[in-house]
């Protein structure tokens, strides 16, 4: 038995897919399990890698991976055995969720610009920031309904972290409470 963690599950027909990571010596390895059978996706030789979210569309399996390279954390997507880098490799980036709608693939997370983490959405590999970058923020989940794309996350303004909802790129602030969002 090895240390590891599962972070996402997807059921397609009678197949159960999970993703996460498993420790392999000095490094963590991103893995995909289909009905309990593991496939190594990335990592394990010179870097750590983690599977964060997955989706299945027809026969295509997609996994969002974060690879902790020696200098920066990089967002990648694994599709049927092929790994593609989504984020700028010259800065830190994180991704937490994926959604598929038709032939469109959406991934959300954040990317560091200077010293600020800016919420970001990637559609078919093309990234778009969701805020101006004036404040730290994250995008945690994406959902597509028809032609509408919904993203939830947070943005820190001063000492308060606000819950945010974006619909088709338009930001809304959820009703304010007395405490920080979580």
Segments (PLM) and residue ranges:
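Residue-level hotspots at or immediately adjacent to binding/recognition sites across diverse folds
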Residues: 1-182
